[in-house]
A protein has these predicted regions:
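Claisen-condensing/thiolase-fold acyl-transfer catalytic domains that form or cleave C-C bonds
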Residues: 1-109
Length: 109
């Protein structure tokens, strides 16, 4: 299971599509799944873009999202989520090729 999620967000629709395509919810469940409380740090069950995303710091094609994902694992984020062992970065959809990364603590391995 993913503890914290960083998603490249050049367009809002892409974030929604990415979350659905990665199996966090089914397309027909979007209205119920996409709530502000779910993605809010630190108490949501899937904190999203804890460094602020493109609006705050990472438009350099997602590099900052990878840095934030690792900071969450190391316990060094300015918006730290408790007990992070698995952090995921999504860099799409809408363009190809794209890549995704899953970073894990030693405990998760």
């Amino acid at each position: 299971d993913i503890d914290v999620l960083q998603s490249y967000e050049n367009f809002t629709g892409g974030v929604l599509m990415s979350i659905v395509e990665h199996g966090f919810c089914k397309p027909e469940e979007c209205n119920e799944f996409f709530t502000n409380d779910r993605f809010r740090a630190p108490d949501g069950d899937l904190p999203l873009n804890t460094s602020g995303g493109n609006l705050a710091e990472c438009y350099m094609h997602g590099l900052g999202l990878n840095i934030e994902a690792v900071r969450q694992l190391w316990g060094e984020s300015s918006n730290q989520i408790d007990n992070v062992n698995v952090s995921m970065v999504i860099s799409g959809p809408m363009v190809t090729p794209v890549s995704n990364s899953i970073f894990c603590s030693e405990e998760a391995l």
